[in-house]
């Protein structure tokens, strides 16, 4: 099996989940999966590829077991000659492999620019996606190859292509922290207003992945700083929640610049509107009334026009102009200015002039009695309105503070409860799952805190808006008595019969002022109505939000109670289990002591039997020596009587030998029985020691057990040494018997030569047969001892393996204990 890797350059990303898709470029190739043309394409042998195509033209688009063509493999390995050959033979350019990647995607993935250019020139589609939703442009962004990206865009690659996470190449470059690619894509007019699945803008992602350079680039592009994601958070909130002070300062400075520009634009539009209004009023009135007009415009117009309405900073200019000029034309659509003006401030001033003339015409035929009644009603209602407004404001402020306090206290309660759960509930999850769970809970808590702070800020801003609106209402109501007093003066002047020309001029000025004030009051009333409607809608929305927050708080309290009950139950259950384990530990310790005592007894018995066996062996060796001496004496003496005595002595020696062999067999039987007992006890000891190991792992008492295992290991080594000594003794005895057999064979040869000593020959033959039997018995014993030695070696090997396992388990327990203490 051969493995080939292509394009080993790797990029550094901010997310670990991206790496497994974009790094490790190239195919994992096995010879068994390839045909001849595929092997030639991998090697870059263009001549071999031509030969394969000449033999079989159908192999041009042949697929291997991974659905790859020769073009895929040639592009991945960067063999330009093979790619040009296959493309000129008109192979399929947009074939997909198992990962739905085309040869173009694979060439860009492996950063083989020459192959990618050839494919693009021959009509490869750059907008096809793989199983991850990535186009060739996404891979070019990841490898930070601007030349490849430029060629893809010049051949019709879609600059706003989306992957599975709805990331455009620009957003993907921001996620991977590729500043060069961000600048390049923005130069190529990539949309900076694109958002991902969570409606996060490019600026939010740059803040989230802590890349101040990209933030600076985006702010220079005049990106929308006030854009919000699904949770209602903007880029500044992301910087605050991730403690990125530098990026937060950048965003704040940019916001200040925007606000300064808007204020300057609003001020200029206000001044132009006031000047246009003043000129229009001067043109419509006679020359004698200029002074009164200047006074009226100073008192009324600048205060109402220049004061900005509450709202977000990027909507202030529009609201100021529209608020002053939208009200009256809605009621009187037939009234239109004679000239169309492009500036919105000028339009507002023209509309205001038309409204004032209309109000002046309507106000002339009004009866004096109705005006007096209105004046009295307004004087009665004014203190009540002030008190009602103040009470409403105080109630709303208290309500918003209560909401923020309840949400913050609920979040803090949830934080402390989750921390308690993390401390007192450690054994429910494994370590890794617990760490991931703690990280997720901390992130959720931080997000909830930021959301609560944002809600609190929004509520404060809205309350400040409402205060400004109520102040406007009070100012409007304060202007009403002045208007009514002016009307009363004009009526009294009309009722007096002796009024002169000067009084007529004063009355004219008062009437003009009255018309202006009425128009202002009408505009203010309309604004107040719209504001009241907006306030009612917002109040309803806030009431709904309060209900939702209360429901969530109730659900969280229930969840906390359930968690507390579960924790108490689990703690009680684990306490019971711990007590049971302690009792079992004591019981196992007692059993282990008993087993140790029985083991000592068995060892003492074995030692006694070994001493007996040694004595029997020594007796046997002495009998062999006596037999040898007797045989030598038999050779020397040829006397019949001596031979008879020797034969009797030999028979006695044989009887003794038989008796000793019987004793030896009995001792061996006992020895085998003791060995069986020892094995059984050893097996039981092993089982109980394993059980004790599991208990002591839970109670961190494995060190004592390691010492016991060391002692057992030393005892087993001593036994092995004893068995090896026995084996050496047996081998020596076998050699000795073989020598005796050789000597007896020589004697037999000598005796056969002598015809007179037939009886001696028969006796010697019998002795030879018996010695052969003894040799056979001793060989069987030696085989048994060898088997026992092998068995003991296997047991030693098992003990060593168990010892290593115990050491590993001890280390793991220590590591888990230290990690738990740290947590």
Swiss-Prot record:
Ranges for region Disordered: 301-343, 356-405
InterPro entries the record matches: Ankyrin_repeat_domain, Ankyrin_rpt, Ankyrin_rpt-contain_sf, CC144C-like_CC_dom
Ranges for the ANK repeats: 66-95, 99-128, 132-161, 165-194, 198-227
Keywords noted in UniProt: ANK repeat, Coiled coil, Repeat
Biased composition (Basic and acidic residues): 371-384
Pfam families for the chain: Ank, Ank_2, CCDC144C
Keyword Repeat among UniProt keywords: yes
Record PROSITE patterns: ANK_REP_REGION, ANK_REPEAT
Top-rank lineage group of the source organism: Eukaryota
Regions annotated as coiled coil: 431-480, 565-724, 776-806
Protein name: Putative ankyrin repeat domain-containing protein 20A4
Organism: Homo sapiens (Human)
């Amino acid at each position: 099996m051969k493995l080939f890797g292509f394009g080993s350059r790797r990029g550094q990303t901010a997310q670990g989940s991206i790496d497994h898709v974009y790094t490790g470029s190239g195919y994992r190739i096995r010879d068994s999966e390839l045909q001849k043309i595929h092997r030639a394409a991998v090697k870059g042998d263009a001549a071999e590829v031509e030969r394969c195509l000449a033999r079989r033209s159908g192999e041009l688009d042949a697929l291997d077991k991974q659905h790859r063509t020769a073009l895929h493999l040639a592009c991945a390995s960067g063999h330009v000659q093979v790619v040009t050959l296959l493309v000129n033979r008109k192979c399929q350019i947009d074939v997909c492999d198992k990962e739905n990647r085309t040869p173009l995607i694979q060439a860009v993935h492996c950063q083989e620019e020459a192959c990618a250019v050839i494919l693009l020139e021959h009509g490869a589609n750059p907008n096809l996606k793989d199983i991850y939703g990535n186009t060739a442009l996404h891979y070019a962004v990841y490898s930070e190859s601007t030349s490849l990206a430029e060629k893809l865009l010049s051949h019709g690659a879609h600059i706003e292509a989306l992957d599975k996470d709805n990331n455009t190449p620009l957003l993907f470059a921001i996620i991977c922290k590729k500043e060069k690619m961000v600048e390049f894509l923005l130069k190529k007019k990539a949309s900076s207003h694109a958002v991902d699945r969570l409606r996060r803008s490019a600026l939010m992602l740059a803040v989230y992945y802590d890349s101040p350079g990209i933030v600076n680039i985006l702010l220079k592009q005049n990106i929308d700083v006030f854009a919000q994601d699904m949770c209602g958070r903007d880029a500044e909130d992301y910087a605050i929640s991730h403690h990125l002070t530098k990026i937060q300062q950048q965003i704040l400075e940019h916001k200040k610049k925007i606000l300064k520009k808007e204020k300057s634009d609003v001020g200029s539009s206000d001044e132009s509107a006031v000047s246009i209004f003043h000129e229009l009023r001067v043109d419509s009135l006679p020359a004698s009334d200029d002074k009164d007009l200047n006074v009226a415009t100073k008192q009324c117009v600048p205060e109402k026009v220049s004061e900005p309405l509450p709202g977000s900073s990027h909507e202030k200019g529009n609201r100021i102009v529209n608020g002053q000029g939208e009200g009256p034309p809605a009621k009187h659509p037939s009234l239109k200015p004679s000239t169309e003006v492009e500036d919105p401030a000028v339009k507002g001033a023209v509309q205001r002039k038309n409204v004032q003339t209309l109000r002046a015409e309507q106000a002339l035929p009004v009866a004096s009695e109705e005006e007096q009644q209105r004046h009295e009603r307004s004087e009665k209602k004014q203190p009540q309105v002030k008190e009602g407004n103040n009470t409403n404001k105080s109630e709303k402020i208290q309500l918003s503070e209560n909401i923020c306090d309840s949400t913050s206290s609920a979040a803090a309660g949830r934080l402390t409860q989750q921390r308690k759960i993390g401390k007192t509930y450690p054994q429910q999850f494994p370590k890794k799952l617990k760490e991931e769970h703690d990280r997720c809970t901390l992130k959720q808590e931080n997000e909830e805190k930021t959301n609560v702070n944002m809600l609190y800020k929004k509520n404060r801003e809205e309350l400040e808006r409402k205060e400004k609106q109520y102040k406007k209402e009070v100012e409007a109501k304060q202007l009403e008595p002045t208007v009514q007093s002016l009307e009363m003066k004009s009526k009294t002047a009309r009722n007096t019969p002796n009024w002169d020309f000067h009084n007529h001029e004063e009355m004219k000025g008062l009437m003009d002022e009255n018309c202006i004030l009425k128009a202002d009051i009408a505009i203010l009333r309309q604004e107040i109505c719209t504001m009241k409607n907006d306030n009612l809608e917002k109040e309803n929305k806030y009431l709904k939000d309060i209900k939702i927050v209360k429901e969530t708080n109730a659900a969280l309290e229930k969840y906390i109670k359930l968690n507390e009950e579960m924790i108490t139950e689990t703690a009680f259950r684990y306490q019971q289990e711990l007590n049971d384990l302690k009792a079992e530990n004591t019981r196992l310790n007692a059993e282990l002591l008993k087993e140790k005592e029985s083991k000592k007894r068995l060892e003492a018995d074995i030692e006694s039997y070994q001493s007996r066996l040694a004595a029997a062996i020594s007796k046997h060796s002495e009998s062999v020596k006596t037999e040898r001496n007797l045989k030598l004496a038999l050779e020397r003496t040829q006397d019949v009587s001596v031979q008879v005595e020797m034969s009797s002595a030999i028979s006695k020696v044989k009887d003794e030998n038989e008796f000793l062999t019987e004793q030896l067999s009995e001792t061996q039987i006992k020895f085998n029985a003791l060995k069986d007992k020892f094995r059984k006890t050893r097996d039981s000891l092993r089982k109980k020691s394993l059980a004790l190991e599991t208990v002591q792992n839970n109670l961190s008492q494995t060190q004592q057990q390691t010492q016991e295992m060391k002692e057992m290991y030393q005892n087993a080594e001593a036994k092995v040494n004893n068995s090896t000594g026995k084996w050496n003794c047996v081998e020596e005895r076998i050699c000795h018997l073989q020598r005796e057999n050789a000597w007896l064979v020589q004697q037999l040869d000598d005796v056969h030569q002598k015809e007179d000593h037939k009886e001696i020959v028969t006796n010697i033959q019998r002795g030879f047969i018996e010695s052969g039997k003894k040799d056979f018995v001793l060989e069987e014993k030696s085989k048994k001892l060898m088997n026992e030695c092998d068995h003991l070696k296997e047991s030693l090997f098992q003990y060593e393996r168990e010892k290593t396992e115990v050491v590993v388990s001890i280390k793991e327990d220590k590591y888990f204990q230290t990690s738990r203490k740290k947590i």
